[in-house]
Amino acid sequence: MNKEILGVLLVSLVVLISGCTMPFGGGGEKQTAMAGTQGLTILYFGPDVEYPVSGQSINLEARIKNVGDAVAKNVEGEIYLLSWGSTNIAKGADLNPPDPEVGREGEEDRLTWRVEAPKVTKTQTYDVGVHVRYNYTTTTVATIYAFSRTEYRKRMERREPIPKVKNIVNSNSPVHVDVRVQNILRTGSTDVPITLVFKNVGGGNVEYNNNTKHYIIKRATVKIGDSTKGCSNIPMKGGREGYCTVRVDIPSTSDEVKLPIEITTIYQYEISAETKISVHPEFE
């Protein structure tokens, strides 16, 4: 009996490690991991029937959910890889984010495409993928520090830390922003460069511009103290990271100035998922 129990436990362990408990697509094919971790995520992509047969009309569906902190707007999906798939763009609804304070989860939606399986005389397996695009917003806040010459000397003498930027916080979104300054800032300085670093952290891609051949961030609005700056069409190198520099004047109202900075970044984001569909011959 102990040997039988041990055997069951070992089989269960192998199943867990191999990932065989993941959802399956139509025709018994294991579904690939879904992209999208901060913003929209794809919960499931595949056919709406478990056993597609030759010539059958079926729906391909993508179930999506907003797990970020902003409203997902202009949601749309497009099928790729599948030669007999639909070329139509499926439009989705705007999806609200979760609200933990009231215990509300992020909104979900379902994108569907009606297709007809090909005629087959033996079981054939096809690759199919979906791109889901949406507009999203990242909100970033931080504090920039500046010091007078007197305060700077005092801190050096006391061997105290002299911060440049602190408390950078990004909303739960697929693009994050880092705030960097090259040198310790002095109060009363003018035309000081502040570098914003945009990072793709969501498992997908920002919009691709066919004219410039770059992935781009549409725009970023930067509020620093009482001034508002902006950047637009920010290229993302390799789709992973982009830069924008804004210039600001530092007031000299005190020996230590703390400048709040708020960055609102707007962009289109795309996530993708792929699976396999097995089409079987008709029953005789």
Predicted regions and their residues:
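Secretory targeting signatures
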Residues: M1-K30
